[in-house]
Amino acid sequence: MILQIDMGNTRLKWRVKNKLASLVEGHCLWSDAEDALMASLMPYGGLISRILVASVRSQEDNQAFMQLLGRLTPLVPEFAYSQSHNDGLVNGYADPERLGVDRWLALLAGYDRHKAYPFMLMSAGTALTLDLVDGQGHHLGGYIAPGLDVFVRAVSHSAAQINVVKSNNLFDASPGRSTVDAVHHAFAAMLSGLVQKSYELLSRNNGFAPVLLITGGDADVVKGLFHQGITCPDLVFSGLDIYFDLRAGNNG
């Protein structure tokens, strides 16, 4: 069995899989990681043969997490890192290792599903990222913006007369008729404009309408803005399969 772990900015996700299927999946906030992870994985500790990790956390956090895993199994976790290229996909960053590994793994999975077609990959979480890939497998770069929660909190904390709590009903980019709507609709309008600009760029240069893939903790929230978008909740895990060459069934 293989334990896959996605160490994000705000949340921790994990799954245990064998050659046939996922056996257990879970996620939690970092503040709950110790109790949630141990409760979920303790029955599988002696059965796990590999631990594969995608982390955007600091080295200190990674070390602390490895110590936590040491209570479960003596195995040494294997960390994925961003690459210049893999499986026909070319990293568009001038310094490929600077691309977040979660973005790289999700791009690998997206490219594996949509080879020969351009696509946009949106990850909606603490940060919102949008990456562009053309029909030849060239990553053209991307955009990084505040996620919805960060955007709402930034506006509320910076303006004394604005006190808004995040809403998950994000489906309208028209002018807001209340402060709450004005803040949320502004985010929706900016995100819609970013996607439209990227859509036009990829369509013009590739001759095909690009696919929009949406992942991340707020994927279901932003999906309401883009009816053509495809929600893909486990792209990072699928990318780990590609990175560690597990697609042929060598899953432990």
Swiss-Prot record:
- Extract the GO molecular function terms from the UniProt entry: ATP binding; pantothenate kinase activity
Write out the entry's keywords from A to Z: ATP-binding, Coenzyme A biosynthesis, Cytoplasm, Kinase, Nucleotide-binding, Potassium, Transferase
Answer yes or no on keyword Transferase. Answer: yes
Signal recorded as keyword: no
Could you give the cofactor binding note from the entry? A monovalent cation. Ammonium or potassium.
The entry's cellular-component GO terms read: cytoplasm
Q: What HAMAP family does this protein map onto?
A: Pantothen_kinase_3
The similarity annotation says:
Belongs to the type III pantothenate kinase family.
Protein name (record)? Type III pantothenate kinase
- Native organism is Cellvibrio japonicus (strain Ueda107) (Pseudomonas fluorescens subsp. cellulosa)
Gene name tied to this protein: coaX
